[in-house]
């Protein structure tokens, strides 16, 4: 049978770091207040000449090098983002052109913080169906451009960045105990929660980009409560359970949410990859950034069982179980 094997990862961050103390100079907050509630110490902010596209290009190039491939080996590019360079055409098309790819196809996926999980799942479907042999999946965001920097409840949480992964279709034995690649995926959404996390603008309504708005306590409650269902479904689909995990790579929204989710699932803290302290919440870039960090520092190794999960505005949420 065919499985989608992840054979390369990459990441990119803007040059500018923004510490909690620096934020405290223009909004009523403090380092201790932010750390206590979120676990975030700093985040990276894109400069004027850094964009969702430029960060995505950089992350993609690193992933290609990591995989020992060139852009000629890629059939499809899927970009997960809520902060594209333009309303249209897609930022994925811009990245495709910048990388020198004139064959294949590319497009954007918008599922906010769950975007990378949704994009991976779509890429997996293309590979298993034979539509593509190799897919470059990118999560890239510049959320600093849609933040209200006077709102301390949101501006302290988010940062900019990009992460990328390459999926390749490979023939495997069909044994989940040893097969490398994506073993299962589960996606969900519920539009009843639109008012809890959203941008208050759009081309069809206000003709503006709008600012990010969030009901933090509501998001926290639902993040811990609903994400575990797709995780349980992922394990059930292959007859496994969380105790078999080597690594848990969750959406890096808030350290308290991550810890509460891991506790609910019975996952030990030493198996949880946490980068929110250094990156903040980078939305669709969060999971691939954390994944690339753990691969590059040697924590995640071939054969490891890894769970990726995320929840985003809408709400949208999903999980991917993969053997590295």
From Swiss-Prot:
Pathway: Lipid metabolism; fatty acid biosynthesis. The keyword Transferase applies. GO terms for cellular component: cytoplasm. It is an enzyme of class 2 (transferase). It catalyses: malonyl-[ACP] + acetyl-CoA + H(+) = 3-oxobutanoyl-[ACP] + CO2 + CoA. The active site is at residues 113, 251, 281. Residues 252-256 are annotated as: ACP-binding. It is found in: Cytoplasm. The keyword DNA damage does not apply. CDD domains: KAS_III. One of its GO terms (biological process) is fatty acid biosynthetic process. Keywords: Acyltransferase, Cytoplasm, Fatty acid biosynthesis, Fatty acid metabolism, Lipid biosynthesis, Lipid metabolism, Multifunctional enzyme, Transferase. GO terms for molecular function: 3-oxoacyl-[acyl-carrier-protein] synthase activity; beta-ketoacyl-acyl-carrier-protein synthase III activity. InterPro entries: ACP_syn_III_C (IPR013747), ACP_syn_III_N (IPR013751), FabH (IPR004655), Thiolase-like (IPR016039). Its EC number is 2.3.1.180. Its main location: cytoplasm. Gene3D superfamilies: 3.40.47.10. Catalyzes the condensation reaction of fatty acid synthesis by the addition to an acyl acceptor of two carbons from malonyl-ACP. Catalyzes the first condensation reaction which initiates fatty acid synthesis and may therefore play a role in governing the total rate of fatty acid production. Possesses both acetoacetyl-ACP synthase and acetyl transacylase activities. Its substrate specificity determines the biosynthesis of branched-chain and/or straight-chain of fatty acids. HAMAP family: FabH. Belongs to the thiolase-like superfamily. FabH family. The last Arg residue of the ACP-binding site is essential for the weak association between ACP/AcpP and FabH. Homodimer. This is Beta-ketoacyl-[acyl-carrier-protein] synthase III. It comes from Bartonella bacilliformis (strain ATCC 35685 / KC583 / Herrer 020/F12,63).
């Amino acid at each position: 049978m065919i499985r989608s094997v992840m054979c390369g990862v990459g990441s990119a961050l803007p040059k500018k770091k923004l510490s909690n103390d620096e934020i405290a100079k223009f909004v009523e907050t403090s380092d201790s207040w932010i750390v206590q509630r979120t676990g975030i110490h700093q985040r990276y902010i894109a400069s004027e000449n850094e964009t969702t596209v430029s960060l995505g290009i950089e992350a993609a190039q690193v992933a290609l090098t990591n995989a020992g491939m060139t852009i000629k080996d890629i059939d499809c590019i899927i970009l997960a983002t809520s902060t594209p360079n333009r309303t249209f055409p897609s930022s994925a098309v811009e990245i495709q052109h910048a990388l020198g790819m004139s064959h294949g196809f590319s497009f954007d996926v918008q599922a906010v913080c769950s975007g990378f999980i949704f994009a991976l799942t779509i890429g997996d479907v293309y590979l298993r169906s034979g539509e593509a042999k190799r897919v470059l999946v990118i999560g890239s965001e510049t959320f600093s451009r849609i933040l209200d920097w006077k709102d301390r409840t949101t501006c302290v949480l988010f940062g900019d960045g990009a992460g990328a992964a390459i999926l390749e279709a490979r023939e495997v034995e069909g044994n989940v105990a040893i097969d490398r690649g994506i073993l299962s995926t589960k996606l969900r959404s519920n539009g009843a929660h639109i008012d809890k996390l959203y941008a208050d603008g759009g081309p069809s309504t206000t003709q503006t980009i709008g600012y990010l708005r969030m009901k933090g306590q509501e998001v926290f409650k639902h993040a811990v409560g609903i994400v575990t269902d797709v995780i349980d479904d992922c394990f059930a689909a292959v007859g496994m359970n969380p105790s078999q995990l080597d690594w848990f790579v969750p959406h890096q929204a808030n350290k308290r949410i991550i810890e509460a989710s891991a506790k609910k699932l019975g996952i030990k803290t030493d198996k949880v990859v946490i980068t929110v302290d250094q990156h903040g919440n980078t939305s669709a870039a969060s999971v691939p950034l954390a994944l690339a960090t753990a691969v590059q520092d040697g924590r995640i190794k071939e054969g490891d069982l890894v769970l990726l999960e995320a929840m985003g505005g809408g709400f949208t949420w999903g999980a991917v179980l993969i053997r590295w």
